Curated annotation (Swiss-Prot):
Belongs to the helicase family. Dicer subfamily. It holds the Pfam family Ribonuclease_3. This is Dicer-like protein 2-2. It comes from the Eukaryota. Dicer-like endonuclease involved in cleaving double-stranded RNA in the RNA interference (RNAi) pathway. Produces 21 to 25 bp dsRNAs (siRNAs) which target the selective destruction of homologous RNAs leading to sequence-specific suppression of gene expression, called post-transcriptional gene silencing (PTGS). Part of a broad host defense response against viral infection and transposons. InterPro entries: DEAD/DEAH_box_helicase_dom, Dicer_dimer_sf, Dicer_dimerisation_dom, Helicase_ATP-bd, Helicase_C-like, P-loop_NTPase, RNase_III_dom, RNase_III_sf. Its EC number is 3.1.26.-, 3.6.4.-.
């Protein structure tokens, strides 16, 4: 006979106030046992173990020990939260890392609830002591084994203190339904680890059995009449083929392993689903996984500069799959595996009214795949509403993990819906096996999972309603035999512990408006941020206020309300059209008794959607640029980067390793003199020809040409001696005859015999007397050196008759010759101060001006080495410096080529691009940086636009501006380590000495740092990208940009080509006939008509929910147009300098010029009018009308419509004058253009049209080039280039005319005519020119500057400025 006892807890801490517990005798039996010793309570699932724990807690609290508290430990976050909600005083989550926080949290409490890990960390850090606790409760105590954190608590802390004699340790209470994990032998292990003994009710065991409903166990085997699903899904088959071809590409095993990590794991999971569930499920899983992965990668592309080779490689591989086909809604029998068909059959048979079931599977991926299959299969789709559960641990895969589609944030909601009955089936892993409170089920299925005794008992325990069933789908005939063995083991366990099932009473739920208003919220687990319903309206208004502001546009949310037949309200909120159509309209989730509540609910639903779209961050404030940058990023004006790469360190190492040697032919071309031919020998190969200008004087330039190397075998010792001989001619003080291990060798010949002959012939010196007696010619003379006093060597110039006088007698004491001192210069790479010595009489000689002078023969001796080799030694610092730069460029080329399809050809451009501070190459560098800047803006704008289709233009612009700023680009270089390639060291010729292998310091693990300005680093990045474009075109530049700036992805346009972006476009935005006229005007036919509509939709159009406004397309189109202009200028780069190109770009892309284009661009069409007079005669009249682009503008602002019409009407005459100046007067009318006024909407639609055509044409620039031609931008640009028409801004021109003078402008209002302004242009406070007019400040300043320029060029106003 069953009996029970009522136990009332009156406002006891740790329990719900006035909570009534119905206590059964077997529970009291367990309570009494726990008061005697450390105990593990073993009772079946659902029989009230938690009540035993509560009784034990209350008994402990009743002792009145105010200094101690009870700690309840749970294995999972979900379970600990569940226990906290029902009974606890304080729930302690993870992450508190401050003792003060712990002390404050535990102050005055009686019960603490946490996971095992939280307590273990707190004990390990010393934040909490076991002596503070009176009772330690382990829920799901069977986990206390091996390396489980529950066992660590006992072994590391409890047992260790117990063995050391500590007395005041807490009592232990364990709770479990099955004290074993695998077999019966683990029982004693658990008891030993917890220092407790397992007990189960004995005296009241019969009563325990009365509260247990055991399900009918039904083992099932598949009938293999269904075709075997051994064929792979088409996507899987295609992906296998791509990977097979990729395996043939040579690559290092380490790199290949990194690249294939993600894609192979995904393949293994997909193959497992293909085998377990069949083709349909595998196809659906792969298709959705790939789409989710691509979208996540695009959304996160700009967040970090750290490359993930595996994910980037996976992205590139998956892009090659092309457009993925949707699964067929009609599932064919051959698309289902036999085991899965068996599962579907059993599910359909088991279904009855009030069905409530679980399906256990092995893999996380199988959970979703099976859910989709059940929801789409004709046998089950109409019977089940499915949810999924995989656990609440926050240690989940990244959002960009290929194959990870689970969102743990939705799982609490899944359990809640299951309890309410809106879901009747959950697909799960072992996460729902134990602990978490779910309603009693009437059907549980185990699908192809190997059961242990523990999992058998736990899963069967979930089916505890009356007449429930536990269906086990088995693979083969061995399954039933194994099941029998488990049942026998359970009988043995029951005999030992008298175990049975448990039952939980679900918590009561309130269902009225006030409670719902309090309970509805948006919670962010990561940050703890929470938005409750009553605050949602304020948050939504704040979000809208952060959207880009624009005239005639209200960014406030608009609420409307509906009242149903029962007097309850629903609200709809409409958000500004700057947002994506999917984010423009939201309804309240239910009807409410008060209009205020409906409004708050709609606002909350809107804010949830904005958060899911990434427009609100984890702190529930509008997303900022910083949210998409690394957390610790700080943009600075200067960055500490690695020291400049020293290629001589590698050269020195190669010399020491006796590597293959390469000879490079070196020619020095000397105008009006013989060329010098040598060989430079290096242990590495330069694979490009290097041209090195050597500036001798203002009029003379030599050219050193170093050709690609070829392998040689030669006597190194001889080569070193020859090199030493050449170097000693100039660097005698730095050259030793003992240490000859030069980093490079210079020799005139490669044959050993000729080298020996060279040494024998030219080593040493000879007296001048002896040389003159041999009647040697000056060209054969070496350097003259004085015996008597230290001085620079002398060069003997070629002479003509009469310039050298030699006496007839043999004993010569003096002679006259044309000589000069050898120059001190060692740097011939720059003009230096040569310009100051400009002369009309230029001589191509090394040294000072030669003079005829009389010299004592005895005072001099002569080097046997001809002086031309001394010239080579003089040029060597300059040549070796350029070789060093090219070697650095060659190493950088190798890094860039890893991602480039096209091999680099112009390494000379790369050598210039890495020298941002070089004066000699400044013009070319600026040209490359100019090109690279525009190209990166174009690419990044496209990437942001495509990857973040839900982001508004303000966020896109901010992120682009921040990332492509000098600091953003510099930070990328700083992180990537590519800063070592930047050349900041200039040649110091006077300190140069021949480099020795023994004197070169080896590379150190601790790289030295140097401070470089952010602008310098950014300029290098742009120039390298510009060099890539100049060398190999768009593809090479894009690949290079992705290396220099890793946030810029080489696959940034993939969503256009695989159909992903097209799925984000609105359907049926407008009938195609509505834009035919617009297409005819533009000369372009849109494939996606919604793009044409969007490009003409003003932000004032709120509530259409068809497209977003044109702001996003305008953002993209501005960069596209800029690149079109820059690429056109690049094709004419030979005829203009970078400053001129920058001026032209500004002139043809600024907003006022685009406004002018919008006003003047039109098409004249004929219209036929049929009139019928009173006599019924038909008259046909033909009239003409002008179709203009702004005629198609969609707007909802009467004020803007009126102002736009007035503006166009007033500007028509001004536009004609501007057109005349542009085409006829060959003059860029800055003043007239600016005077047109600021009608931003017109320039915006020009840019948005470029953006629309670019996207519609699949990022085809040719279509945009044609549009620029059609609009008249390219013809006008060509006109300005061919006629060399200046486009410099008047202010810039005035400042250029007056270098060093301070130019300023003074504006005052005419006192007689208050509407008139007077502006004076001043140079150092002296007036140059003044103008008057009725215009704004900016225009009148431009007019004053223009007038001043005109006067100065005509010679006026010079006296005032002199």
């Amino acid at each position: 006979m069953t009996s029970s006892t009522d136990y009332h807890a009156d406002s006891t801490p740790g329990t719900t106030s006035n909570m009534e517990l119905r206590i059964r005798e077997y529970q009291l039996e367990m309570l009494n046992e726990s008061l005697k010793r450390n105990l593990i309570v073993v009772m079946p699932t659902g029989t009230g173990k938690t009540q035993v724990a509560i009784l034990r807690i209350l008994a402990d609290i009743d002792k009145g020990n105010s200094d101690k508290f009870v700690w309840l430990l749970c294995p999972t976050v979900a379970l600990s939260e569940q226990q906290y909600i029902q009974y606890a005083t304080v729930f302690l989550p993870s992450g508190a890392e401050d003792k003060a926080i712990w002390d404050n949290a535990l102050s005055g409490i009686k019960i603490a609830v946490s996971t095992y890990q939280v307590l273990y960390d707190a004990l390990s850090h010393g934040f909490v002591k076991l002596s503070q606790m009176s009772l330690l409760i382990f829920d799901e105590a069977h986990h206390c084994k091996k390396d489980h954190v529950a066992n660590k608590i006992m072994q590391v802390h409890y047992h260790k203190q117990h063995q050391s004699g500590v007395q005041n340790l807490p009592k232990i209470l364990g709770l479990t339904a099955s004290p074993i994990l695998s077999d019966l032998s683990s029982l004693e292990i658990v008891e030993s680890n917890l220092g407790s003994i397992c007990k189960t009710p004995r005296q009241y065991y019969a009563q325990l059995l009365q509260f247990t409903n055991r399900p009918l166990i039904l083992p099932r085997l598949p009938t293999y009449t269904i075709p075997n699903c051994s064929v792979k899904a088409p996507i899987l088959e295609k992906l296998c083929g791509i990977l097979s071809s990729e395996d043939e590409v040579p690559s290092s095993s380490k790199m290949k392993s990194k690249q294939l990590k993600h894609i192979r794991r995904f393949m293994q999971t997909s193959e497992s689903i293909n085998q377990e569930l069949g083709i349909w499920a595998a196809t659906e899983y792969m298709r959705k996984s790939i789409m989710h992965f691509k979208e996540s990668m695009r959304m996160g592309a700009e967040k970090t500069n750290i490359s993930n080779y595996g994910k980037d490689f996976a992205m590139e591989i998956l892009t090659r799959l092309g457009k993925l086909q949707d699964c067929s809604p009609a599932i064919q029998p051959e698309e289902i595996s036999p085991m899965c068909q068996c599962l579907l059959d059993e599910l359909s048979k088991a279904y009855r009214e009030g069905f409530c079931g679980l399906v256990f599977v092995t893999q996380r991926a199988t959970v979703l795949a099976l859910k989709w299959l059940i929801e789409n299969h004709p046998l089950t789709s109409h019977l089940f509403t499915c949810g999924t559960f995989i656990g609440m641990s926050t240690t989940q895969y990244s959002k960009t993990e290929l194959g990870n589609l689970h969102d743990i944030r939705n799982q609490t909601e899944t359990l809640e819906k299951f309890r309410q009955g809106s879901l009747n089936l959950i697909i799960t892993t072992d996460a729902l096996e134990e602990g978490i409170d779910v309603p009693a089920c009437n059907t549980v299925l185990n699908f192809n999972c190997q059961l242990s005794l523990k999992s058998f008992i736990q899963r069967r325990g979930r089916a505890r309603r009356e007449n429930s069933q536990f269906i086990i789908i088995m693979e083969d005939e061995s399954g039933p035999r194994y099941l029998k063995r488990l049942e026998m083991e359970e009988i043995e366990l029951v005999q030992k512990l008298q175990n049975a099932e448990r039952r939980q009473i679900p918590a009561n739920e309130l269902d009225f408006d006030k409670y719902e208003r309090i309970s509805l919220s948006l919670d962010i687990d990561r940050t703890g941020a929470q938005l409750i319903m009553r605050e949602a309206v304020g948050y939504l208004y704040n979000f809208c206020s952060k959207l880009p502001a624009q005239l005639y546009v209200s960014n406030k949310p608009l609420f409307t309300y509906e009242r149903n037949n029962y007097g309850r309200f629903r609200a709809v909120v409409k958000l500004p059209s700057n947002l994506d159509p999917s984010l423009q309209s939201f309804s309240s989730s239910r009807s409410w008794s008060r209009l205020k509540y409906a409004r708050e609910d709609a606002a909350l639903q809107a804010y949830k959607a904005l958060y899911q779209a990434g427009l609100v961050n984890d702190y529930l404030v509008p997303t900022q640029v910083s949210d998409h940058l690394e957390g610790d990023i700080i943009f600075r004006s200067h960055y500490s980067i690695q020291n400049q790469l020293d290629p001589w360190q590698d050269i020195a190492l190669l010399w020491k390793l006796d590597s293959q040697l390469y000879a490079h032919n070196l020619r020095i071309i000397r105008p009006e003199e013989d060329e010098i031919h040598l060989h430079m020998i290096l242990p590495t190969q330069l694979d490009t020809t290097i041209h090195i200008p050597l500036f001798i004087d203002y009029c003379t330039t030599y050219t050193a040409i170093l050709t690609p190397g070829h392998p040689i075998t030669t006597d190194i010792s001889l080569c070193q001696q020859v090199t030493n001989l050449i170097f000693q001619s100039v660097y005698r003080d730095h050259c030793s005859r003992r240490n000859l291990d030069y980093a490079f060798l210079l020799v005139p010949e490669l044959e050993e015999t000729k080298l020996i002959e060279f040494l024998e012939r030219y080593s040493g010196s000879v007296s001048l007397t002896e040389l003159l007696n041999q009647e040697a010619t000056p060209s054969a003379l070496g350097l003259l050196r004085s015996h008597t006093r230290p001085s620079r060597p002398l060069l003997v110039e070629p002479w003509v008759a009469g310039e050298c006088f030699l006496p007839d007698e043999l004993s010569i004491s003096s002679f006259d010759a044309k000589v000069k001192y050898m120059t001190n210069r060692r740097n011939f790479l720059s003009h230096g101060n040569l310009a100051a010595g400009k002369s009309t009489n230029c001589e191509a000689r090394i040294g000072l001006e030669a003079n005829v002078k009389s010299m004592s023969v005895r005072d001099f001796f002569v080097d046997k080495l001809p002086s031309m080799f001394a010239q080579v030694a003089l040029f060597t610092p300059s040549i070796s410096h350029e070789v060093e730069v090219y070697m650095i460029a060659q190493i950088l080329r190798q890094e860039l080529s890893l991602r480039s399809v096209t091999p680099w050809q112009r390494i000379d451009l790369l050598a210039i691009a890495i020298r941002p501070t070089s004066i000699e190459h400044r013009a070319t560098f600026r040209l490359l940086a100019f090109i690279g800047d525009a190209f990166m803006k174009y690419l990044f704008a496209m990437q942001l636009f495509l990857h973040h289709h839900l982001w508004h233009e303000g966020l896109l612009s901010s992120l682009k501006q921040r990332n492509l700023s000098d600091a953003g680009l510099a930070h990328a270089i700083h992180q990537s380590g590519l800063g070592k390639f930047l050349i900041s060291k200039h040649l110091n010729g006077k300190r140069w000495v021949p480099p020795l292998v023994s004197g070169i310091e080896p590379a150190s693990n601790e790289a030295r740092q140097r401070s470089i300005g952010a602008a310098t680093l950014a300029d290098m990045t742009k120039a390298v990208v510009g060099a890539a474009f100049t060398d190999g075109g768009l593809n090479q530049a894009a690949a290079c940009a992705s290396v220099m700036f890793p946030k810029l992805k080489s696959w940034n346009a993939s969503s256009l080509h695989d159909g992903t972006y097209s799925k984000t476009r609105p359907e049926n935005a407008v009938a195609s006939t509505a834009i035919v006229d617009m297409e005819e005007l533009l000369g372009y036919t849109f494939t996606d008509k919604s793009l044409a509509v969007e490009s003409m939709t003003h932000p004032s159009c709120t509530g259409l929910v068809q497209t977003t406004s044109y702001r996003r397309l305008s953002f993209l189109g501005a960069s596209v147009l800029e690149w079109i202009v820059v690429s056109y200028l690049h094709r004419h780069a030979q005829v203009m300098n970078p400053q001129r190109m920058q001026s032209l770009k500004s002139a043809f892309t600024n907003n006022t010029f685009l406004t002018f284009i919008a006003i003047t661009f039109h098409q004249v069409r004929e219209q036929n009018h049929i009139d019928v007079d009173d006599e019924h005669n038909v008259h046909k009249n033909v009239t003409t009308c002008s179709i203009r682009l702004w005629d198609f503008l969609r707007l909802h602002s009467d004020a803007l419509s009126t102002e736009l019409s007035d503006f166009v009407q007033k500007s028509s005459e001004k536009a004609d004058a501007i057109k005349h100046e542009l085409w006829e007067q060959r003059f860029y009318p800055w003043v007239r253009l600016r005077a047109l006024g600021d009608m931003r909407v017109l320039s915006d639609i020009i840019q948005s049209i470029f953006g629309a055509v670019f996207i519609d044409s699949q990022a085809t620039l040719a279509s945009c080039d044609a549009l620029a031609e059609k609009l008249g931008i390219v013809p006008l640009l060509e006109h300005f280039i061919s006629h060399q028409i200046t486009t410099d801004h008047p202010k810039d021109t005035l400042q250029a005319i007056l270098p060093g003078r301070k130019v300023s402008y003074q504006i005052c209002v005419d006192k007689v005519h208050p509407g008139t302004l007077r502006c004076s242009a001043l140079a150092d406070s002296s007036e140059i020119a003044s103008v008057e007019g009725q215009m704004n400040d900016e225009v009148i300043k431009m007019q004053a500057a223009e007038t001043a320029v005109r006067l100065l060029r005509k010679g006026f106003a010079l006296s005032e400025t002199s």
